[in-house]
Amino acid sequence: MGNHRSDLKATRRWVVKVGSALLTANGRGLDTGCIQELASHIARLRNKGYTIVLVSSGSVAAGMERLGWRRRPRALYELQAAAAVGQMGLIQAYESEFQHHNQHTAQILLTHEDLANRSRYLNARSTLRTLLRLGVVPIVNENDTVATEEIRFGDNDTLSALVANLVEAELLVILTDQEGLFDADPRHYPNASFISEAAANKTELDGMANSRAGALGRGGMITKIRAARRAARSGAITVIASGKEPKILQRIASGETVGTLLWPDRQPLAARKQWLAGQLQTKGRLWLDTGAVKVVREAGRSLLPIGVLACEGNFARGEVVSCLDSDAREIACGLVNYNAEETRRILGHSSHQIEQILGYVDEEELIHRDNLVLL
């Protein structure tokens, strides 16, 4: 299994995610003391040679305070307005604190569309890597002002994992208001067992996360487990720990047994396949027969039309589609070589029949293995 805590000592490129529960004072407004301490600890690590990207929530809560709202609004446009107002205060607070340590910050606001589009994804990656090379602390948040409910990341746990993929971080630290992961919610089940370490893809974690007692903080246990799995695709270790613990970042860096460590238990994906695996929404779905599931999953081969039973959605050539088994479990996703209408016509047929059916043939494969990633 290896000494994963000891491995933390060698990490130098981090993504640190901090949630609203830590940053807000009693759920409203920003906790300036927390921001001050967080900036101080990050600055100290950076002075020791660490490069750190900070993914920070808190804009809506900060905006509510500035607008004098006592209750969190339900309407999306009001939440977006609060986020727009609050993001100013959030960045001002971070900039002020980091300036005390003679360190510059940069604001990066991302949407799902920024990372779903390959060109914009590469641009975001280049910008983040350039900022790190220049010694700047990038502060990342979801661009709530323009994101719609249908295409949101949904939580900054997910965003932080995708950022970890972008910058090829060695470690993702998720700071929450709990000490780590439990097999049940310790606030309701006092006898819940603490999980110190586990493989990120350990199947038993799914059962814990899907149980009613599986909540952790506001994002929930399931989002943190999924984030660890996403981060693991680029080889990153994830530590989920309490941001209320003193000097928590320094203690993690020293290899101390704090929080829950989830280590990557699969080979890292190539950069292009990391992008594919990071797609939160797909344009369509393909149902595969048993034989196709086996060759895709076990042999790593391309998906041929003959192995597809059904097709759902309205997608164009080159868009991302999901591949499902007979139980509707998503096993893979990839860039499809034919549009939805063409796919419906050729599914279930051999590749040599494509030209006879369509009158032309672009590719023999419905999804080439180079554009297909297992999930």
Swiss-Prot record:
Protein role: Catalyzes the transfer of a phosphate group to glutamate to form L-glutamate 5-phosphate.
Binding-site residues, ATP: K17, T176, D177
Single GO biological process annotation from the record: L-proline biosynthetic process
Leading EC class: transferase
Pfam families, sorted: AA_kinase (PF00696), PUA (PF01472)
Name this polypeptide is given: Glutamate 5-kinase
Stored NCBIfam families: proB
SMART domains: PUA (SM00359)
EC number: 2.7.2.11
Family label: Belongs to the glutamate 5-kinase family.
Gene behind this protein: proB
PANTHER family: GLUTAMATE 5-KINASE, ISOPENTENYL PHOSPHATE KINASE
GO molecular function: ATP binding; glutamate 5-kinase activity; RNA binding
Record flagged with keyword ATP-binding: yes
Keywords assigned by UniProt, alphabetized: Amino-acid biosynthesis, ATP-binding, Cytoplasm, Kinase, Nucleotide-binding, Proline biosynthesis, Transferase
Residues reported to bind substrate: S57, D144, N156
Gene3D superfamilies hit by this protein: Acetylglutamate kinase-like, PUA domain
Compartments, as annotated in UniProt: Cytoplasm
